[in-house]
Amino acid sequence: MGCGTSKVLPEPPKDVQLDLVKKVEPFSGTKSDVYKHFITEVDSVGPVKAGFPAASQYAHPCPGPPTAGHTEPPSEPPRRARVAKYRAKFDPRVTAKYDIKALIGRGSFSRVVRVEHRATRQPYAIKMIETKYREGREVCESELRVLRRVRHANIIQLVEVFETQERVYMVMELATGGELFDRIIAKGSFTERDATRVLQMVLDGVRYLHALGITHRDLKPENLLYYHPGTDSKIIITDFGLASARKKGDDCLMKTTCGTPEYIAPEVLVRKPYTNSVDMWALGVIAYILLSGTMPFEDDNRTRLYRQILRGKYSYSGEPWPSVSNLAKDFIDRLLTVDPGARMTALQALRHPWVVSMAASSSMKNLHRSISQNLLKRASSRCQSTKSAQSTRSSRSTRSNKSRRVRERELRELNLRYQQQYNG
């Protein structure tokens, strides 16, 4: 999930106390083919939730019929065998401290497992990244550079890091509350006041990041997780694989083209230098989805999608928009503006009347029915177009995969047309 450009090496820890293993000698034993060729999937993965039904899509594939001459050991149940298999891929220093429980996420160069601290029995997530691959190395460097600096209630916390010659193991908080839109579907009621509570937590985390010179660059619903299943759970921001970290107060412009198409800001599409205002555009898209269950910009054709974004044209037609307050629409309008200089900052967004009125006059109309129907309708449509049963998940309507990442060639062609039109 890297941007395709090299990044600087991680900074030393500042705000977080880390137990960092600088170098671990290779295993003296013989490595099996499974160990050497561990990564086989085709997508990257960020910090992943656990304990939520949808996590089953990341489970280890069910074994097929046994091949000739091969049978499962009768003394070891399949689940125990799978856990043992993944445990064997971890450095002994990790398994000495953490008990490997289950695989909860996988990617082309990473795995995320649920673990338990042997001494305290506290659950954590460990993200294991194969740094021998360039893309994995870039994502690892980016995440470590950010997570070593941050300490905020609404941002995933790094606990400690173990490093070997070919892998990095990042021990992080375990978010068990599920994804944002999965919770909305399950809740049965969702009002503007609920929306402002969610956005206030996310905005406070983004404000903190921007104050440190950190731009997330890939804010989207699946990177916003509930910390626990309770109704009072906080939201945490995850997945900093595309993040840019600069020195505090440094206003230097960024140029790397990266992000997820539906959430990417216009200035990135035309390959102009950009600032952390790209995160605010993405938050405008998230706010729009949060209040309607639909996307402001959407088209299966990338070129048409990008043209929609460049024009900044979206609609408030259809349900539930007639029931949404003008104040909420004004909040979105001030974020989804093509001119990055005119967009609200995170601090300004926190002070917007719609967010400030969260506990007082925000609309209490229940938008749940329309939002749920829109999310499920879009998920069903996506399922038919991809012929994938997994697409029926409610939050699948806002998900992206590697094939949906921004492609340099498409942006070069789009930028050429844009320049020709502008100069003509």
UniProtKB/Swiss-Prot annotation:
It comes from Homo sapiens. This is Serine/threonine-protein kinase H1. Belongs to the protein kinase superfamily. CAMK Ser/Thr protein kinase family. The active site is at D218 (proton acceptor). The modification Phosphoserine is found at S380, S381. Residues 385-398 have a biased composition (Low complexity). InterPro entries: Kinase-like_dom_sf (IPR011009), Prot_kinase_dom (IPR000719), Protein_kinase_ATP_BS (IPR017441), Ser/Thr_kinase_AS (IPR008271). It is found in: Golgi apparatus; Cytoplasm, Cytoskeleton, Microtubule organizing center, Centrosome; Nucleus speckle; Endoplasmic reticulum membrane. Serine/threonine protein kinase that may be involved in the regulation of pre-mRNA processing. It may phosphorylate components of nuclear splice factor compartments (SFC), such as non-snRNP splicing factors containing a serine/arginine-rich domain (SR proteins). Reversible phosphorylation of SR proteins may cause their release into the nucleoplasm and change their local concentration, thereby influencing alternative splicing. One of its GO terms (cellular component) is nuclear speck. Changing R121W: In PFIC13; likely pathogenic; severely reduced protein serine/threonine kinase activity. The lineage of its organism: Eukaryota, Metazoa, Chordata, Craniata, Vertebrata. A lipid is attached at C3 (S-palmitoyl cysteine). It is a lipid-anchor.
